[in-house]
Each structure stands twice: as structure tokens, then as C-alpha cells.
């Protein structure tokens, strides 16, 4: 150890199959510098699954974790079959029962997804995310079968299956890899048409040695592509959560990012391959052959040992491990230097800004300009009242500053409650599609009111029954019910 406090892992990417049934030409696993997949077992052996589950349980117990997330990944995880995935889920539940909450997700290309898989995932409460790059034209630029056939119809069928009332609660979202040759607004529209609970828009993995495709003379076309979607998303009243934009907004307000591609939060994720070896993030496969390797495995090493690896330690030190250029940047708290893999350059390794530096700067500044009430609102991550103001108010001697702090805190809370109901309701399985559509329409009214007459909106949100209604709705949603049907 280097004297730092070890930050435990709470997310584990468990590779259950190392091969794939598609041949996507932008895949970082098969088309990148690291080719370690060639020497690994296709399906995870039972001994590896059992030992991985035990190691995760040991780590949870040692660090008294209240929750761990396991993502079943590949390759294509559904190639492991229903029986193979069930065996892995049994091992995970057995090892973690009584220790902490276990959240399991699976990320799939969707082409094999059917009712039998969904019934298994329903039985074990497994969330399902699917990769789709847009409409048929956009998706089929890269996501094809080996013989060149389109994968779109099979993936669309899988998404419709997940969107049905029976399995809607399993649907965790869609993941889209950006290609600037595709029309951004059309991509956004085609994804939103599936009514996913959330979207993720990913920059294609690239490095300074292997930069992303760009039109000659354009330094920020990825930012421009994302900005077109952000502006449409905002104009639509934020009908779906988009992780990239949510993370920028949250980090601008002083919070944490929901993605390793942004922000300064320490990495808390470990990959476990089908042969039981521990690896760092899969994205590092684009840097050089062996880049994600740790030299450690589940049979010999604890997860604490993995977290002591220099590559992981570097991503737990925040701003201290960024390049000098990044440390001087005004948006470093939000950008965080970009994804670690995207900083790689031969000779200087990862001590560089992201190969998407100009794009990230432009995108973050655009979001900040469109949401001025968010920018610099660091109070979201701290107490609404300073200690001095709290003491003054408690003693009955609070002055204008203390009262102002209290007023701002109450205003923030009033505004946050409807947003919390909206976000929870969109993803709740008990909320039928017509009700979600009404929620979107109501949210659009709030967004327009906030833009046109924020004072009037504050008056509405200050109604004495708003808090009671919102708390009641959140309680119903957390118990698996619909939002309050009696609310007008």
C-alpha cells in the first residue's frame, strides 16, 4: 500500500462467456490491442463461478458492505445458456445470503433473449441492459452477424419483450455507442421510441495512438453530436434518464458521476474473467495488449490485493493522478480527465488528457450554460445549513444569512421532491405506460414553467400539501406500487 485508505470494490463484472454471436467492428474485446480472450475458457467453469462468489462475499464481509452489484458480462453472456446462468446465480445467492444486498444485472446484445431467459432473470431479480446503436441504419453500421446480416430485428424483438408488462421491471436500459456518421437526433428518437428507463451514450473507445474517427478539420464533432441530443432531450422535458448527461449535471452541482467516464469519484469496480483472473476495466483493452491485466486470480488472491494494484490505485486518487493539463482545467471536477483508457499514449502512458478532451470541454460548458441554476451549486453534496447558521437558528438568534441558508435549503428540497417522484415513476414496473406518458407531460409543464416563470413555479411547489404528496408517492413506488392515483 502507498499510505492511502483502501476503498473497497462494490461492483464486479463477472465474465460468464468469452465469445460472442455478433461481429461488431467497434468491439473493444475482440477488435482492440488486447487479445487475451483467445486463451480463455468460453464459458465460466463452475469452480471459477463458485470461487468468484466466495471472494465477493469475503470482500463484502470484511468491509461491511451493505450492497454489491454483479454484472454478468461477456462476450455475450446469454451464450452461457439458461442453465449456465442459473448455476452462476445460485452461487452468488448462496455466498452472499445474509451478508448484504445483491443486485445482479446482465448486459447483452439481445439477439438470444427470449421468455426462458426473462423468466430466469425474473426469478432472481436480474436487471437487463441491451446494446442498440439507434435505428436499423445506425445499428447496422457496426452491429452485424459474422456473415454481414443485420442484427436489428432480433434486438428490437428483445427490447419489445422486455418492454411488455410481464418483464418491464427487468428492463434497466439501452446502451448506444456513438458513431458521428449517424444523425444524432434520429438516433435519440429511435431509442426513446422503445421507452427505456434510461439510456447510455458511449464515446467509442480510443487512445492518442488510435484516435477516434473524425471529419477533417473537426476537433469537437463528438461534442456537437451529443449537444444536438442534449438540446432535444431538454426541449422534450427530459423524458428518459441519460447517464452521460445526468453525470455531467450531477458533477457540475458537486455530486458524483454515475459513470467511470466522467468525474473524480474513485473506481470501485473489478472484472473477473472466465478463467478466474482479475482484471481492471475492460476499456483498457484498447490501450495495449495486456493493459487490463493484474496478474492476480480468484484462487490465490483476495479482492483487497486487487485494489492495491497500481492501475486501480491510480484511479482511486482523484485529481492527484491526473495530468498537469487536467489539474489546471476549469471543468476537471466534472470531466475527471475522461475515461482512463482514453488518456493512453505511447511514451507517457496515461498521464495525458483524454483523446476526447476538446469534446468533453465543449459538452460540459454547453450543459453548464443551458442549466445555470445547476452550475456551481456545490451545496447539493453538503448540508443545507452551515454549522454556524444551524447553531444561530437553534438559539433563536439567526440573522439574515442563516435564514437565507434555510430558505435556499427548503427551496432545493421542494424542487427535488417532484423530480424524485418523476425519476422513480419512470422506472417503476407498476406504473403503466399511459401513466408514464402523463408523468412526462406533467414534467414538461414544470420544465416550461421553470424557464418562463420560476417565481410562479416556486409558489406552486410551496403548497403545504406538496411534500406530503411526494413522500406518499415515493413510499408507494419503493414498495412496488404505482404513484398516488389521487393526486391532481
Regions inferred by a protein language model and the residue ranges of each:
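Accessory C-terminal segments flanking Radical SAM cores
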Residues: 245-358, 362
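Short Fe-S-cluster ligation motifs
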Residues: 51-73, 352-384
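Radical SAM/AdoMet-radical enzyme domain recognition
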Residues: 49, 53-71, 80-204
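Charged, amphipathic alpha-helical linkers/stalks
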Residues: 371-421
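Cysteine-centered iron-sulfur cluster-binding motifs in ferredoxin-type domains/subunits
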Residues: 15-23, 76, 326-328, 332-333
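Radical SAM enzyme [4Fe-4S]-AdoMet core and its adjacent flexible, acidic
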Residues: 142-153, 160, 164-266, 271, ...
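N-terminal [4Fe-4S]-dependent radical SAM core
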Residues: 1-13, 63, 431-434, 438, ...
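Canonical Radical SAM [4Fe-4S] cluster-binding loop centered on the CxxxCxxC motif
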Residues: 6-47
Amino acid at each position: 500500500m502507498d499510505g492511502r485508505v483502501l476503498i473497497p470494490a462494490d461492483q464486479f463484472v463477472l465474465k460468464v462467456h468469452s465469445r460472442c454471436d455478433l461481429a461488431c467492428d467497434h468491439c473493444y474485446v475482440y477488435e482492440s490491442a488486447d487479445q487475451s480472450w483467445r486463451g480463455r475458457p468460453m464459458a465460466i467453469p463452475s469452480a471459477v463461478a463458485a470461487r468468484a462468489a466466495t471472494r465477493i462475499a469475503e470482500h463484502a464481509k470484511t468491509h461491511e458492505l451493505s450492497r454489491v452489484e454483479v454484472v454478468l458480462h461477456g462476450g455475450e453472456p446469454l451464450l452461457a445458456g439458461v442453465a449456465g446462468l442459473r448455476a452462476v446465480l445460485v452461487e452468488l445467492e448462496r455466498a452472499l445470503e445474509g451478508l448484504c444486498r445483491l443486485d445482479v444485472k446482465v448486459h447483452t446484445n439481445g439477439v438470444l433473449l427470449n421468455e426462458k431467459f426473462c423468466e430466469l432473470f425474473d426469478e432472481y431479480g436480474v436487471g437487463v441492459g441491451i446494446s442498440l446503436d439507434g435505428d436499423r441504419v445506425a445499428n447496422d453500421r457496426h452491429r452485424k452477424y459474422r456473415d454481414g446480416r443485420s442484427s436489428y430485428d432480433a434486438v428490437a424483438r428483445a427490447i419489445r419483450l422486455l418492454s411488455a408488462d410481464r418483464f418491464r421491471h427487468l428492463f434497466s436500459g439501452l446502451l448506444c455507442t456513438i458513431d458521428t456518421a449517424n444523425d444524432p437526433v434520429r438516433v435519440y428518437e429511435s431509442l426513446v421510441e422503445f421507452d427505456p428507463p434510461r439510456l447510455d451514450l458511449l464515446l467509442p473507445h480510443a487512445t492518442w495512438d488510435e484516435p477516434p474517427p473524425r471529419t477533417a478539420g473537426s476537433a469537437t464533432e463528438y461534442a456537437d453530436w451529443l449537444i444536438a441530443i442534449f438540446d432535444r432531450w431538454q426541449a422534450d422535458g427530459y423524458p428518459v434518464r441519460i447517464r452521460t448527461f445526468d453525470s455531467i449535471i450531477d458533477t457540475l452541482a458537486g455530486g458524483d458521476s454515475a459513470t467511470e467516464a466522467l468525474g473524480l469519484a474513485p473506481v470501485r469496480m473489478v472484472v473477473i474473467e472466465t478463467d478466474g483472473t482479475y482484471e481492471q476495466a475492460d476499456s483498457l483493452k484498447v490501450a495495449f495488449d495486456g493493459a487490463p491485466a493484474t496478474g492476480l486470480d480468484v484462487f490465490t488472491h483476495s479482492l483487497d490485493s486487487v485494489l492495491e494494484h497500481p492501475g486501480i490505485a491510480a484511479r482511486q486518487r482523484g485529481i492527484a493522478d491526473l495530468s498537469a493539463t487536467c489539474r489546471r482545467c476549469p471543468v476537471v471536477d466534472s470531466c475527471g480527465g475522461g475515461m482512463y483508457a482514453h488518456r493512453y499514449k505511447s511514451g507517457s502512458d496515461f498521464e495525458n488528457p483524454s483523446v476526447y478532451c476538446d469534446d468533453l470541454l465543449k459538452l460540459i460548458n454547453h450543459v453548464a450554460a443551458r442549466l445555470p441554476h445547476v452550475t456551481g451549486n456545490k451545496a447539493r453534496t453538503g448540508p443545507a445549513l452551515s454549522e454556524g447558521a444551524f447553531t444561530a437558528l437553534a438559539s433563536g438568534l439567526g440573522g439574515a444569512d442563516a435564514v437565507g441558508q434555510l430558505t435556499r435549503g427548503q427551496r432545493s428540497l421542494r424542487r427535488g421532491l417532484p423530480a424524485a417522484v418523476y425519476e422513480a415513476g419512470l422506472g417503476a414496473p407498476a406504473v403503466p405506460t399511459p401513466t408514464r406518458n402523463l408523468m412526462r407531460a406533467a414534467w414538461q409543464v414544470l420544465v416550461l414553467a421553470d424557464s418562463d416563470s420560476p417565481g410562479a413555479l416556486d409558489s406552486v411547489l410551496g403548497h403545504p400539501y406538496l411534500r406530503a404528496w411526494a413522500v406518499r408517492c415515493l413510499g408507494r413506488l419503493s414498495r412496488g406500487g404505482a404513484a398516488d392515483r389521487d393526486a391532481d
